[in-house]
Amino acid sequence: MTIFSIRSQIIIGVISSVILTTIILVIAYKLMWFNGHMTLTLAITTMITSCLTLSICSIFINPLIQKIKQFNIKTKQFINHEKFIDDETFQSPREIKELNDSFNKMAYEINNQMNMIKNEQQEKTEIIQNLAHDLKTPLAGIRSYSEGLRDGVISDPQEVHEAYEILIKQANRLSILFDDITHVINLNTGRSYPLELIQLDQLLVNILQPYEQHIKQENRTLEVNFCTDIDAFYQYRPPIERILTNLLDNALKFSNSGSRIDIIISECKENDVISISIKDEGIGIVPELQSRIFERTFRVEDSRNTKTGGSGLGLYIANELAQQIDASITVQSDLDIGTTMTLTLKKFQFKK
């Protein structure tokens, strides 16, 4: 179906009105409402008026048509992912200007969304590449020691015991890597958690109990300092446990055996917030890198992840979970002295 242009439709409309007016005048003449001279005068006047109307309409309609053509070109450029430049000096009716402004806003939002998607895809690709690289080391270790045990290459009882210990460590490392992958995938699923009444002492017992044997083996000192008068409060338990677990893992990984770790809990009643700090005596973080440690693809040092068995995603996961529960994580670190990570939580009021 052929669609006429705006200019053609206006011309057709004017011609149609002239023809219709002429027909009415002829009928009026036949019915003797007007004499011949008056009918001719009215017909000529109608034609002249119509021509003037058409000319005036053309003068006013041309800028509108040009703006629509420009808008059409800009739309095609946007579809073809070409950069378009909007002429702000070009005059147009209010409705067309509003349409143009709406289109520009839509294009801007779409471009932002597309850039965000591209960046996320790029980051996901980097994460997968990093994790694939991390998986090779424990898998290679498991394979080599398994083959050694199978073929009898490792036969001395002490060596066999050490081989089993290494296999267990590498299996645990794989478990940590897959656990990190699962948490990264779940971060953007919009998962919600119920508010729970949290007792700090019970929360710390649940978090620290799995580390008890590890802390003893490494001859570490773990001190917990908090006021006993801190009342129970409502918060989201699963994210908090995961955040503190990741922060504690980070403190253990990047500090030496025999060193001290402090967990300090304080309350600011004026702002209704709880602060939980985990302080280590580890290697520390240089100032220029402290603002980047929560990035998804950032690693302070690849060799350290190989040594500690981590994926480098622990702090990223912790920070993302903190944002989801309206909390925050801050870092204070001195190179070769230690690092303090502080989780600040709001105390929510339970609403039934």
Swiss-Prot record:
Residues that span the membrane, as ranges: 9-29, 41-61
Subcellular location(s) per record: Cell membrane
Xref: InterPro entries: 2-comp_sensor_kinase (IPR050351), HATPase_C_sf (IPR036890), His_kinase_dom (IPR005467), HisK_dim/P_dom (IPR003661), HisK_dim/P_sf (IPR036097), Sig_transdc_His_kin-like_C (IPR004358)
Role noted for this protein: Member of the two-component regulatory system SaeR/SaeS. Probably functions as a membrane-associated protein kinase that upon sensing the appropriate signal, autophosphorylates and in turn activates the cytosolic response regulator SaeR.
Pfam family, one: HATPase_c
Single annotated GO MF: phosphoprotein phosphatase activity
In-chain residues carrying the UniProt-annotated modification Phosphohistidine: H133
Record EC number: 2.7.13.3
PTM entry text: Autophosphorylated.
Membrane topology: Multi-pass membrane protein
Source organism, top-level taxon: Bacteria
Originating organism: Staphylococcus epidermidis (strain ATCC 35984 / DSM 28319 / BCRC 17069 / CCUG 31568 / BM 3577 / RP62A)
Name this protein carries in UniProt: Histidine protein kinase SaeS
